[in-house]
Amino acid sequence: MTEHVRERKAVRLHLTNIAGLGAVQLIQSLLPNFERLLDYKLEAVYLPSRGELSNYETACHETKLICYKRYLPNSISRLLECTLFGSKFDGTTPLLVLGDIPVRSKTKQTVFVQTPLLAQGASTGRQLGAIKYWIARWLFKLNIGYVSTFIVQTEAMKAALIDTYPEIIGRVHVIAQPAPLWLLESQLKRTQRNIRTDSGLRLFYPAAVYPHKNHRFLRAIQADRANVWPVSELLLTIPENLNPNPAIAWIHCVDRLAPDKVIKAYENADALLFLSLSESFGFPLVEAMWIGLPIICPDLPYARTLCGNQAIYFNPEDLNSLYVAVVNLSERLDSGWWPEWSENLKVIPRNWEEVAAAMLGLATDEGEAA
C-alpha cells in the first residue's frame, strides 16, 4: 500500500524591519513554531543584517536564510525596499511580512501590523516621531493594493486601522498572542501579594525608551511629594542616564533585562504599572494577566480591550489621576483584593503554535475571517 504524503504549503517570511524589543521577542516566539508546523514549510526567511534576528539559525535544512543588507540610512533603505526594490520579493510563494509596511511586490502578500502608530490619531509624543510615522502611513497607504490580508492583534487595533484606511475593510483579521515563550515556560503564577516588612508598593514597568511609552509622564512627580505616594519601588527597564525623574528615590532604572531577570521582577512586584499612550497589543499587559498580577494602566481603548474591568485605570494626561489609581491599588491590596483574569485570558491563544498556524493559514488562504 502506498502511503499518502500530505503536501506542505510553502511560505516566505519577511523580517527585515524587525528591530524593537517587543517585536523581536514576539518573532522569537513565533519562528520555532512556524518551523514545527507539519502542514507548512518555510521556503525562505528574509532577515535583518543587524540585531538579534540577524543571527537566526533555522532547524530546517530546506529553509533558505537571506540577509537583507542595508547600505544607506535605515529610513531611506526601507523606503527603497518597499517601493523601487520591492520586486526582489516577487514570487509565486506567498509572502508573510512581519514588519508593518507592505512591499511593492508581485506575490500573495499578508502583512502583520504591530505598531499602532500607523493608525490615525496615534501619537509618538514628539515632532520627529510624528514626521517619521506620517511617512510610514503614506508608504502603507501607497502599497495597500499589494496586500491580500492584514493581521492585527486586537479588535481595537482592527477598528483603528480600518478607520484610517477604509479601503482595507474585509481584509483585516485579528490574531491575538499569548505571553512570550520564555514566560510561558517559566510557569510563574501569582495569587497574592508578597509579604514584606516595607509597606510601599513595588511596581514594575518593562518598556524600552520610546516616546509613546510615556516615561516622561513621571517627570511631573514633585520631589517634596514623593513620600505621599504609597510606593517603595518603581522599576523601569531603561538606562539610569534616562531616568525621567532622578529626584524621586523610589524610581529605579535597571536598563534592559534578560528574560530571567524580568521573571524575577514579576516575582517581586505587587503590580504592573503601564504608562504607554499607544499600543497595538501591549505585551506586558498580557504577561501580567497570565501571571495573575494587578495592573494599573491608561484608560485607553487598547488597555480596555485586553483588561476589561479588572485593571485599575488612570487618565494619561493627569498625574493626580495616576496617584489616585496607585492609592486605590494600595487600599485594595490591604483589604485582601486580588484580580481575577480568567475571563480576559479566554480570548488569548493557549500557545504560540496556535498563533503560528493561524497566521500561516491566512497567508496561504486557509484561514477564516476574524
Question: Residues of each region from the PLM?
Answer:
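Conserved donor-binding/catalytic core segment of Leloir-type glycosyltransferases
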Residues: 12, 194-213, 219-222
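Active-site donor-binding segments of glycosyltransferases and PAPS-dependent sulfotransferases
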Residues: 24-101, 253
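Membrane-proximal helix-turn-helix segments that form the acceptor-binding/catalytic region
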Residues: 130-150
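Donor nucleotide-sugar binding/catalytic pocket of nucleotide-sugar-dependent glycosyltransferases
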Residues: 145-163, 167-186
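Nucleotide-activated donor-binding/catalytic signature segment of Leloir-type glycosyltransferases, i.e.
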Residues: 238-263, 268
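Aromatic "clamp/platform" in nucleotide-sugar-dependent glycosyltransferases that forms part
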Residues: 277
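Short hydrophobic beta-strand element within catalytic cores of glycosyltransferases
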Residues: 290, 294-297
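Conserved acidic donor-binding segment of nucleotide-sugar-dependent glycosyltransferases
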Residues: 312-320, 326-333
